[in-house]
Amino acid sequence: MKNTTLCYLEKDGALLMLHRVKKQNDVNAGKWVGVGGHFEEGESPYDCAVREIFEETGLVPAALSYRGVVTFVSDEWETEQMHLFTSDDFLGDDRFPRYTGGEEKETDCIEGNLAWVEKSLVPTLPLWEGDKIFLSLLAENEPFFSLKLVYTGDALVSAIKNGLPL
């Protein structure tokens, strides 16, 4: 099982989102996601989140909230356990453009284009169905949760939160 982190940075009613449009053979191609990535040897979830945020954005979180663990099971890729964080307290140049729909601006992230997206606009973006579930839980300030998302191909076939089907 692979371990990853994902973090949603928040500022002025918007989330920093990454539109995955630059990498070849990307399972997330065309989707909007938070920032994060794979663990390196010896990293804790917190260490990984801080490193990935800095590598992808140049920002350094001053504080992170550990919000949940999401387990992805699929018939097409390795099972993944994703550690989910949020932060509204970070240091650095948060110069990324605001995305309001339509054409987006190119940014220097090698994985895609970064943009601040109004929270109300996020559900209208191309997202994984499971991401819509945990983004909703984050928006509702759900206490720490365990979420299991099962996919057949690109289709979400099962979602279980804290042991109970959704």
Regions found by a protein language model. Give the residues of each.
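Flexible, glycine-rich phosphate/dinucleotide-binding loops
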Residues: L16, Q24-N25, V73, L91
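Unchanged
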Residues: F39-A62, F72-L138, A159-L166
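Conserved N-terminal beta-strand and adjoining loop/helix that marks the start
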Residues: M1-M17, V35-E40
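Acidic/histidine-enriched, glycine/proline-rich intrinsically disordered or flexible terminal extensions
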Residues: F144-L166
